[in-house]
Amino acid sequence: TPELCVPRDQWHLERETPWGRMTYIDYRYKVEFGWREYAEIDRFCREQGILWFASCWDEPSVEFIEQFDPPMYKAASASLTDHDLLRAMKATGKPLAISTGMSTMEEIESAVLAIGLGRLLVAHATSTYPCPASELNLRMIDTLKRKYPITPIGYSGHEPGLAPTVAAIAIGACFVERHVTLDRSL
């Protein structure tokens, strides 16, 4: 829902896009999926036996995605401090994975306090794309495991190559998220 997620002061900022120059709000509408696109994802994944889920960026999107009955939800790092959104995803009764990029330990603790530990997964992340190895801070996985010993702790990797992801698993990450793109211009 771009009109809810894009700050108003950014709506009319112009930018170059694969479709030419346009305002940021128009660009967001171009790249957002609607019912038809999500229905196609759902159909394809069901045919292939793939479980899929989404990161919702606002509360109406949680309600929208619920019609596809995802097995879980994922909160993007930028949403960690949006406790109302986290609660909306948690209220579905499905597991919720939260990413921690750009967050302080206090912000992580506040989010966990707001939604509770039940059906929660926490992913250590950095929010640099691509992330240099010197900024990965994989030791945070151990810190999170000590802080939340009964909670699955994972790793969300945004770096080139797979070695850091393998290292994250070796030091205890029990799930991973990887970002993949077919077109860097989008």
Language-model-detected regions and their locations in the chain:
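Catalytic cores and adjacent flexible loops of soluble metabolic enzymes
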Residues: 1-186
